[in-house]
Curated annotation (Swiss-Prot):
Transmembrane segments: none
Pfam assignment, any one: FBPase_C
Cited HAMAP family: FBPase_class1 (MF_01855)
Catalysis performed (reactions): beta-D-fructose 1,6-bisphosphate + H2O = beta-D-fructose 6-phosphate + phosphate
Subcellular location: Cytoplasm
Name of the protein this chain belongs to: Fructose-1,6-bisphosphatase class 1
Assigned EC number: 3.1.3.11
SUPFAM superfamilies: Carbohydrate phosphatase
Molecular-function GO terms, alphabetical: fructose 1,6-bisphosphate 1-phosphatase activity; magnesium ion binding
UniProt keyword Cytoplasm, yes or no: yes
Organism listed in the record: Bradyrhizobium diazoefficiens (strain JCM 10833 / BCRC 13528 / IAM 13628 / NBRC 14792 / USDA 110)
UniProt binding sites for Mg(2+) 1: E90, D109, L111
The family this protein is said to belong to: Belongs to the FBPase class 1 family.
Taxonomic placement: Bacteria, Pseudomonadati, Pseudomonadota, Alphaproteobacteria, Hyphomicrobiales
The keyword Magnesium is annotated on this UniProt entry: yes
Length: 345
């Protein structure tokens, strides 16, 4: 692995390409340094008192674990040394305003999937880098298409950094001996059609009819309109699901549903859906709410939630088509629809 391109060399080349590029490269480098520290903390587990114990709830009401707090502190310390106009985090109620003359704003989910810590499953860090507007009150109300860069880190069997700087997607793997990230895969492309779908099927009774119809088509396999079989996956970690899609294709669905608190979806637009959608599109895939392109949306509040369907473009397009089907749309209020399908008799 020693002969492969180092992340810092990759960022050095990029830093000379545009007026904002140096600021973006410096922020990515700081996030990578924080990720190495977080990876060590997670890897030590209980030996380093890095437990998945809950410490309360964050500002948006989600369960907050000790590692969420520690990861947030590490990232804020590393990014706090830089010239950044505004910083937003899942663990913060409001954005932190910094250098008003800076060119960039950064949004982070310090530790996505932290509920998986207890069972030793993959967790990660997600980040989005945006231009700094003249009015910093609007810093995190921009469309997703405005992003300069986005990425995520997976802490699993390998520690990997998935990165787009607006010109394709590359994957860097942590070289633990050298203490740096090195290029492992470049110019990632998601297959147009996938053979896997990921959704929490236990919530089927709560889904809207278009989502149920799509999953029923997947389950019908070669005997249905898709004309090929699917496998089902569900990890419960957004970074793990996204990494699988980038490397194997397929589609991930976290739709809105009828449960209290899930009517607008569950994932946050600014620091989860936006960066993931940017990465997926840069790799040739698609990302949608089922009705709208994720990157066309602008957040009305920092912690706004949205549905997210992302992955191979054929499958995402089919979900959107079903959301436009007048019969399915009309049946959303029809209770008997819930009795149909492969999971109900």
């Amino acid at each position: 692995m020693t002969g492969q391109l180092r992340l810092d060399d990759h960022l050095q080349r990029y830093s000379e390409t545009a007026p904002h590029a140096l600021a973006v490269a410096t922020a990515v480098d700081a996030i990578a340094a924080a990720a190495i520290e977080i990876a060590d903390l997670i890897g030590a587990g209980d030996l380093a008192d890095a437990s998945g114990l809950t410490t309360g709830r964050n500002s948006d009401g989600d369960v907050q674990r000790d590692l969420d707090v520690q990861a947030d502190a590490i990232l804020r310390r590393c990014l706090g040394k830089l010239s950044i106009a505004a910083l937003a985090s899942e663990e913060m109620r409001e954005p932190q305003i910094g250098d008003r003359a800076a060119r960039i704003c950064v949004a982070i989910d310090p530790l996505d999937g932290s509920s998986n810590i207890d069972i030793n499953m993959t967790v990660g860090t997600i980040f989005s880098i945006l231009p700094a507007p003249d009015d910093l009150a609007l810093a995190f109300h921009q469309r997703g298409s405005a992003q300069f860069a986005a990425g995520f880190v997976t802490y699993g069997p390998q520690t990997s950094l998935v990165l787009t700087l607006g010109d394709g997607v590359d994957i860097f793997t942590l070289d633990r001996k050298a203490g740096c990230f090195r290029l492992a895969r470049s110019a990632i492309q998601i297959s147009e059609a996938g053979e896997e779908f990921a959704i929490n099927a236990s919530n089927r009774r709560h889904w809207d009819p278009p989502v149920r119809a799509f999953i029923d088509e997947c389950l019908a396999g070669v005997e249905g309109p898709a004309n090929h079989d699917f496998n089902m996956r569900w990890v419960g970690s957004l970074v793990a699901e996204a990494y699988r899609i980038l490397t194997r294709g397929g589609v991930f669905l976290y739709p809105s549903d009828a449960r209290p608190g899930y009517g607008d979806g569950r994932l946050r637009l600014t620091y989860e859906a936006h960066p993931m959608a940017y990465i997926i599109e840069q790799a040739g895939g698609s990302a949608s709410t089922g009705r709208e392109r994720i990157l066309d949306l602008s957040a009305q509040s920092l912690h706004q939630r949205v549905p997210l369907i992302m992955g191979s473009s054929n499958e995402v397009r089919r979900v959107e088509e079903l959301h436009c089907d007048p019969l399915l749309v009309a049946s959303i209020s029809a209770p008997l629809f819930a009795r149909r399908g492969f999971f109900r008799l």
